[in-house]
Swiss-Prot record:
GO terms for biological process: phosphoenolpyruvate-dependent sugar phosphotransferase system. It holds the Pfam family PTS_IIB. This is PTS system fructose-like EIIB component 1. Keywords: Cytoplasm, Kinase, Phosphoprotein, Phosphotransferase system, Sugar transport, Transferase, Transport.
Amino acid sequence: MSKKLIALCACPMGLAHTFMAAQVLEEAAVEAGYEVKIETQGADGIQNRLTAQDIAEATIIIHSVAVTPEDNERFESRDVYEITLQDAIKNAAGIIKEIEEMIASEQQ
């Protein structure tokens, strides 16, 4: 089974931080061996929308947001790791590692 990380990034203005966080998360996830899909919710609306299949197949789901995302109910049946946009931008690789460690300890 392949590892899949999905994320949703959103901020009030949806201009810079949303896309900076998305880019850094994508780079860190690929480096960690994940298939990646990231939805952004910004000034230009929802881009790269996460589907029900994406959500069902995800190993890790991250919300890096500064606002409540649109269509947030899609994630109600899954564990979602919520982080700030600043944390994603500054330490995406470290956050992914922390989440992996939490998941591993829960499975023991």
